[in-house]
Amino acid sequence: MTDYLLLFVGTVLVNNFVLVKFLGLCPFMGVSKKLETAMGMGLATTFVMTLASICAWLIDTWILIPLNLIYLRTLAFILVIAVVVQFTEMVVRKTSPVLYRLLGIFLPLITTNCAVLGVALLNINLGHNFLQSALYGFSAAVGFSLVMVLFAAIRERLAVADVPAPFRGNAIALITAGLMSLAFMGFNGLVKL
């Protein structure tokens, strides 16, 4: 049980996908201008990353390895992610049309989010079992969502702040992301992985 807790804390804080592994930067910068949109994207990405990581592990373990088709891993995982994203898009459209409109083009773009493919490939490379794969996918998504929501809250405050003209827009956003990354580096000694 301790191993699973360490995996969760380590993935969310110490090895954060956005701030440490630099995966998922496109939605991190693109959807983080409003807190509501960032929260919605975080929830959708959490659902997709968790489900895609489980499905990828199952396909790898039950189909690709037994049939010696390991060279098709990346292609198979991309197809799995596309199916999961389409399912998520249908669910969001039915349950929350407002959120569906807010997310706009970014919802289908979860398919091309490198963090989703990264979590599936890292699960296999790290040799995780089924439970570890599910937890790793969920933890990576929670870390992604946490950072995106924090970043969106900071960007909303910066939008009304008196920022010098050369630093407005993406410049201050990148500086803020760098400072957040430095803050998360403080968790490095927390968990030994």
Curated annotation (Swiss-Prot):
Its EC number is 7.-.-.-. One of its GO terms (cellular component) is plasma membrane. Coiled coil: none annotated. It is found in: Cell inner membrane. Its main location: membrane. GO terms for biological process: electron transport chain. It is an enzyme of class 7 (translocase). It comes from the Bacteria. Keywords: Cell inner membrane, Cell membrane, Electron transport, Membrane, Translocase, Transmembrane, Transmembrane helix, Transport. It is a multi-pass membrane protein. The chain crosses the membrane at residues 5-25, 39-59, 63-83, 102-122, 134-154, 171-191. Part of a membrane-bound complex that couples electron transfer with translocation of ions across the membrane. Required to maintain the reduced state of SoxR. Belongs to the NqrDE/RnfAE family. The complex is composed of six subunits: RsxA, RsxB, RsxC, RsxD, RsxE and RsxG. This is Ion-translocating oxidoreductase complex subunit A. It comes from Shigella sonnei (strain Ss046).
